[in-house]
C-alpha cells in the first residue's frame, strides 16, 4: 500500500508494522486516497489551496489548520515524550513533533498511518505504529498521552465488559509518574445535539440525549460529570476541564473551568461552526442564538459541545486557563494568544513564517506607537513569544463601540480628543489609564 510513493519520498519517521493485522477496520472511502495525493504533492501543512479547490467535509476536516488548535496552545514540558493514540491522518501529529522530544503515534488504519507518515515526512523524532493499542507492547513510559476523538470508540475496539474504564486503566500504566493524559471528546449533552444535530458517531438526532438506546453500536460519549467520574474511577487522581469552542474538532477558542465565557464574549457567528450543513431537516433550534442565555444562566459547562480533559495524579494542572487561536488567517499571521495561571498573556506564533515576520513587525508597531506618545500595554520578547502582563481593563475599541450603541456621540468625540491630545503631548499620559490601547493584532485576541 503506497510502497512506491513512500520509497520515492523517503520520509524520516519510523514506520512500524509489527502489530498490524492486515486489515483496516474503518475508512472514509476513496477520499482518503485523494487526501494522501494532496499531502504528497504539497509541502507539509501547506494544503489551503488544494482544500478549497476540491472542497468537501472529509478533505477539510483532515487537512484544515484549525484541527491543530486543540493542542497547539498547550504547554508541553521541554524534552518530553508523548504517545498519540489514534493519530488518524496526522492532523495533530506535527504539533506534537514540534513541541516534544519524542513522539510515538499509534493508528489502527494503515492507510491513515501512511497519510501521517507522508504528512510528517520531515519529522525525525516520530515513530508511527500501525495496530490496535490493546495489542501493542511498549518498552517505555510517556510524559503525555493523547486521546483525541478516541475514547468514545472503545466499546468497539476494546473487548471487555467495561471497555471505557479498562482502556483508561491500560493507558494509565503507560504514563510516567505525574504524567498527563489529554482526552478530547464530544459532550453527550452538547448544545448542538439539543438543537437537533445528528449524533456525530451514529448519525441519529438525540441518540446521546436518549441514552444511546442501541448499545450494540459500541460507541458513545459522556456528560461532564460522567466523564469526570469515569476518569477518576480509572485511577487518575485529578482532572482539569477545558471547553474548546465551538468544538474540539475545529476550535477557535479554548475556555476552561477557571475562565468561562462571559456575557460580553464573542460567542456568535464570528467563530461559529455551521453544524446544519449535514442535514438541516433535523434542526429544531438555532444554536448560535442560544449561547447568550446559556452563558447568562451559568450552564455553559453542561452544554459545551466538547471537552478537553487534562488527567493526572499530579495536582499541577491548568497552567493555561484560556487560549484564542487564529489558524484561519494567512500563514504569516497565525498566532495563539494564551492566558497563564500567573496572570501573563503570551502570544505564540504558530508558524515559522509568523515568527519571522509578523512578530517582528508587531514589536515595530509597538515602538512606533510609543514614540508617537500613545500609552499602550508593555510587551516583551520571551523565547520567540510576545509576552505581557494581564490587565483587567476595557479596550478603547469596546468603549467607543458601546458609546456608539448608546448614541453617545459626545463621549466618542471626547475619547478621540483625548487620544489626539495625548499624541500631541497636550494632556497627561495617564488620562487614558483606564483604557487599554492595543495594536490591531491585539485588539481581538483579549476581549
Where are these regions (language model features)?
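Short alpha-helix
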Residues: 217-241
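Conserved ATP-binding subdomain of kinase catalytic cores across diverse folds
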Residues: 316-397, 407-432
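Class I SAM-dependent methyltransferase SAM/SAH-binding core
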Residues: 99-127, 132
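Conserved SAM-binding loop of SAM-dependent methyltransferases across substrates and taxa
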Residues: 89-100
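N-terminal auxiliary segments of SAM/dcSAM-dependent transferases
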Residues: 1-41
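A short acidic, Gly/Pro-enriched loop at the edge of an enzyme's catalytic core
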Residues: 137-145
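Conserved class I S-adenosyl-L-methionine
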Residues: 182-205
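A short glycine-rich, Lys/Arg-flanked "PGG" loop and its adjoining helix->strand segment in the class I
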Residues: 162-180
